[in-house]
Amino acid sequence: MWSYISFRSLLAFMLALLISAWFGQHFIKYMRRKNFTETQRDAKIDPFGVQKIGVPSMGGIIIIASILVPCLLFGRLRNIYMLLTTVWFGLLGFLDDYIKIFKHNKDGLHPKAKIAGQMVLGLIVGLTLYLSPDAVIRENITKTRTVDKSEVIIHKSEPVKSTITTIPFFKNNNLSYTEIMSFCGPYKNAAGWLLFVIVTVLVITAVSNGANLNDGMDGMAAGNSAIIGLVLGLLAYVSSHIQFANYLNIMYIPGSQELVIFASAFVGAMIGFLWYNAYPAQIFMGDTGSLTIGGIIGVLAIIIHKELLLPLLCGVFLVESLSVILQVEYFKLGKRRGVKQRLFKRTPIHDNFRVLPSQLDPDCRYVFGNWPRSATHESKITVRFWIATILLAALTIITLKIR
């Protein structure tokens, strides 16, 4: 039974969920007893009067423990970079939360230091995948039968190191970073790997920050991440199974089945954490959790060569990030012209849906000041964002067959 990946994955899922639920209860009591709770909250971002002050934070510790224990028990430590990612981002987020809670500095870790930490981990992962002899694929190719001229999908017999990744809506589902850099002539292979490492750094940094921005309402980030983790686990499974890889016309990645166990533990930890993080939250994951889950999603997608599916799969994270970027740039543009202006009532975009008219700045021009016309309770906003992520997850899976 131990050789069956499905058996070990289910065990990892259940144990992660149970650890998260059991440990969470005791962790919340400990944090309350020590008074390690939210102490700095702007009432303006809480239009429904939900009392956030006094709720323990740093719940990401629960998530990290719930992921690591099942992976160490039921997984093989071949994919050590997933464990490294979890610990690295956990420490980065913990440092940020520590400064906020214990040093009473609401800004936390300096943004440049946070970005630097994310980029360093991205660089480590990118270089590891470049240097490791185990990071190989068997490329999917299309051949035409001589008898009936029909096309069939086969995989090359020898595993190779490759910069090929899965891309949606293209006929053969593949994109090679090396081919993109073909203009470099004899140096295209080195240039292709350099581009791959750069993309790795950007993806990990972007997804980690996107998850961090999405963590603004009770249960929001945990629910969205559980859905995304489920899809990535499914993609890891079909990538590790040569028959499924043939059917879906995607590359076969030997050894990626162990990532299914990690993804299962990740989903279990998220669902278990929701037991306490669902509205009204008894604990917040803090940056210890949000940075970690974003980093895990980014690294997992890169290892299974599905990072170009993330703009669709993590569409909610993408929209949250873009809303903040556009809001800041539009505000700066107006400031240079001496005009106080904003695109949205508030960002990240999920906050835009719960702002009351009385909370708007009367001296500011809002491009979308009438959208939406009325405020929505945060629990309903959260569920609607989950539904959006479910739809995006379904579309992501569908793209594997749309060419």
Feature locations, PLM:
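Juxtamembrane helix-capping/reentrant segments at transmembrane boundaries
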Residues: 41-55, 106-117
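Extracytosolic (periplasmic/ER-lumenal) interhelical loops and adjacent juxtamembrane/interface segments
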Residues: 146-186
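Flexible loop linkers connecting adjacent transmembrane helices
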Residues: 30-47, 99-102, 106-107
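Individual transmembrane alpha-helix segments
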Residues: 170-202, 208, 382-385
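Short juxtamembrane and helix-loop transition motifs at transmembrane-helix boundaries
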Residues: 42-51, 81, 104, 180-189, ...
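Alpha-helical transmembrane segments
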Residues: 1-30, 35, 63-91, 120-146, ...
